Amino acid sequence: MLRIYNTITKSEEVFKTLNNEEVKIYVCGPTVYDETHIGHGRTYVSFDIIRRYLEHIGYSVKLVINFTDIDDKIINRALNLNVTPKKISEKYIEIFLNDMKTLNVKPADIYPKVTENIPEIISFIDKLIEKGFAYKTDSGVYFEIEKFKDYGKLSNINLENLISEDKLESKSEKKNRFDFALWKNKKSGEPYWKSPFGDGRPGWHIECSVMSMKYLGEQFDIHGGGRDLSFPHHENEIAQSSAYSGKNWVNYWVHTGFVMVNGEKMSKSLGNFVTISEISKKYSPEVLRLFFIQRHYKSPIDYTEESMEHAKASLQKLYNVIESVRIALENPVNSVWDENEAFFYNVLKNSKINFYRAMDSDFNSVNALKTVFEVSNSVTKYLSVSKSPNVALLIKTLDFFKNVGEIFGLFEGYFYKSSNVKEESLIKFLVDLRDDLRSKKNYETSDKIRDGLKELGYQIEDSSKENTVFKKINI
């Protein structure tokens, strides 16, 4: 039973979807004014693994990741380079999507842009004003946090303390220092859109509320992002979204930990970041994915050359083990079942159980990865003591690694390269081996191969007149 840590309740909860087998997820996307660094990469790889696991255990996932393509940072970058904000945003959207492809992050179902949803944003703000949660000033429209009594629940901030400690300058138009902008009236030289409250552009927080509701509905399952977005961004999103609909907007809040460099968060503002394109020149994307997987998604992770080299060596070890299993299958194999087979079978069976148990416990990749190396070490030992390994065990071992690869986004270079040619070659080898065993009337072993292939999704069709036929089936 899957359990997820919910930031808003500060507890691990049994995961229950709003709509049967479909999971709707919204992850805050990048403000596209610069290149993607590995701190961003960790967030999107983490949610990619969450998405992959949910799909693996039978859910249908609808994922939305937005692009903030109009913002102060984008405008300032455009002014400095004497180009339009659109030119800046389009450039870095393309870079982001290429970086995600490099990292083997599965594409979102929808990548909405702020500038393509302005009418919906204006309508949303208009309703908040109508319901008394927002007010107009000469500089724009603000959300009045005092009107939303649950403000601060996500980030554990006391609303009364915020209000009592507030000291506004007399010249401020806001009723409270923490009231946040829904709409910013235009300034000279900046892009703007016409609205009932004046020409201008959206504030940062409003965009995610509007786009998530547009594509996922007024209530959905999971909202995520980096831990730094918890306050004020996600707190403000909750306030305006719940005020708008009167409903509980999101069921589970999921936040990823920081990538740290010398004890500080990796960030553009500190200048201590490494871009995806830079690190990809030195390490394969799978090394970076394994580096992330070695820590729980909620925990901070220290980026060092040593940690990257460790991840590189660990990945190579796993590839070597998978290749050794494949080579063993190319040599004569049998159905012998003695204490060596029994011992390894129990390791494999228990490791598989513990892998899923770990992933069901808030996607605990750390404990899940331990089971992968348990299988790796055990099959290495098994192959070293067995002159003729058991074919069914070897098939199950490859199947285990393939499932791990599908969930973690690893082993692409082995299982999925060249349109699965390697897999089909292996299956054909096993089918031919089975034919040979049948011709020698070794039906016990040939039946085990048939059953093992069926578990992998291949159906055997025997014929007395021609070679055995195999075909892929849904399992």
UniProtKB/Swiss-Prot annotation:
EC id: 6.1.1.16
Single GO molecular function: ATP binding
Subcellular location: Cytoplasm
Binding locations of ATP: K268
InterPro entries, alphabetized: Cys-tRNA-ligase, Cys-tRNA-synt_Ia_DALR, Cys-tRNA/MSH_ligase, Rossmann-like_a/b/a_fold, tRNA-synt_1_cat_dom, tRNAsynth_Ia_anticodon-bd
Motif 'HIGH' region: positions: 30-40
A Pfam family the protein falls into: tRNA-synt_1e
Cofactor note text: Binds 1 zinc ion per subunit.
Domain of life: Archaea
Catalytic activity: tRNA(Cys) + L-cysteine + ATP = L-cysteinyl-tRNA(Cys) + AMP + diphosphate
The protein's name in its UniProt record: Cysteine--tRNA ligase
Name of the coding gene: cysS
